[in-house]
Every structure is written in C-alpha cells, then in structure tokens.
Curated annotation (Swiss-Prot):
This is Thiol peroxidase. The keyword Disulfide bond applies. Residues 19-168 form the Thioredoxin domain. Pfam families: Redoxin (PF08534). The gene is tpx. Belongs to the peroxiredoxin family. Tpx subfamily. The active site is at C61 (cysteine sulfenic acid (-soh) intermediate). Keywords: Antioxidant, Disulfide bond, Oxidoreductase, Peroxidase, Redox-active center. InterPro entries: Redoxin, Thioredoxin-like_sf, Thioredoxin_domain, TPX, Tpx_CS, Tpx_Peroxidase_subfamily. The lineage of its organism: Bacteria, Pseudomonadati, Pseudomonadota, Gammaproteobacteria, Enterobacterales. It catalyses: a hydroperoxide + [thioredoxin]-dithiol = an alcohol + [thioredoxin]-disulfide + H2O. Homodimer.
Length: 168
C-alpha cells in the first residue's frame, strides 16, 4: 500500500499509510543530538507532536521547526519531536543558531524503519529515501489523535489543526 504526495507539483510515492486517528503509534528509536538512542517510551505520560520533514536545511522545514518551537509553549504536558534524516549535528547547529529550545530534534540516522512504519518514506523522485512532510499528534498513551500527510512537500503543515487537537 502506498500514498501519493507532491514535490514541486510532481507526484512522488510514499510507502505505506500514515497512522490515522484512533490507531496506536508504533514504538520507535531515533537518534538525539548527543547521538544517544531515544525511544517513544521515554516520553510516556506526555502528549507528543511528531513534526516529520525531509531536511532542516530547507526553508519550509526550518519554518515548521520554528513554528512548532513557538507552539510548544502554548500547550502543557506536550513534547514536540522534530524528525528528519538530517545528522544530529546539523539539527543541533540549526536549533542553536536559531535559539530554539522548546523542540527536540531526532534523526532517522540509524533507523529508516521509522519512515516505513509511520507511512512517510518517499520511495521515488528526487527526495527518495527522505521523509514526506507530516504531523502526527499522540496522546499520553501513544494513541494517534491527529495526523496530516501534507500533499505538497513544499507547503507547511496545518499548525492550527494540530494545536486545536491539543487544546481540545
């Protein structure tokens, strides 16, 4: 099973299907800025926003990290996990230069299974192997309460929809 999104108006295929509201999030282990392994279970009891994107070195991806850094201050008991294939060094450099301290950057460096399991792996086109742009919101028990696979990778996600779910 696959989905189609667009990159600069050209269709690209995304493997599998993004988790839908009501489903249980799959466990994952990703790489933190200090190169340690971080698992979903480390955020047990907190709501999670998974801001997933191709690379922090693009304008739209960087804008999403900045916006979620701001929104993270508006909701309680919530962590924002910004997930990309970027090396942890690049993620850390970006957040340091931008003064962003309300989000946690995580890399798929040692776990490409995350992309497959979360239905965001681009399998053709110029961004093959990277993540499609998506936002997945989990409750305290890792149940999906919101998900959006952005149809055009060069567009920002629906921040208000994600925030409204957290404020409901």
């Amino acid at each position: 099973m696959s989905q189609t999104v667009h990159f600069q108006d050209n269709p690209v295929t995304v493997a599998n299907v993004i988790p839908q509201a009501g489903s249980k999030a799959q466990a994952f282990t990703l790489v933190a800025k200090d190169l340690s392994d971080v698992s979903l279970s480390q955020y047990a009891g907190k709501r999670k926003v998974l801001n997933i994107f191709p690379s922090i070195d693009t304008g739209v991806c960087a804008a999403s990290v900045r916006k979620f850094n701001q929104l993270a201050t508006e909701v309680e008991n919530t962590v924002v996990l910004c997930v990309s294939a970027d090396l942890p060094f690049a993620q850390s450099r970006f957040c340091g230069a931008e003064g962003l301290s309300n989000v946690i950057t995580l890399s798929t460096l040692r776990n490409n299974e995350f992309l497959k399991n979360y239905g965001v792996e681009i399998v053709d086109g110029p961004l093959k192997g990277l993540a499609a742009r998506a936002v997945i919101v989990l409750d305290e028990n890792d149940n999906v309460i919101f998900s959006q696979l952005v149809d055009e990778i060069t567009h920002e996600p629906d921040y208000d929809a994600a925030l409204n779910v957290l404020k409901a």
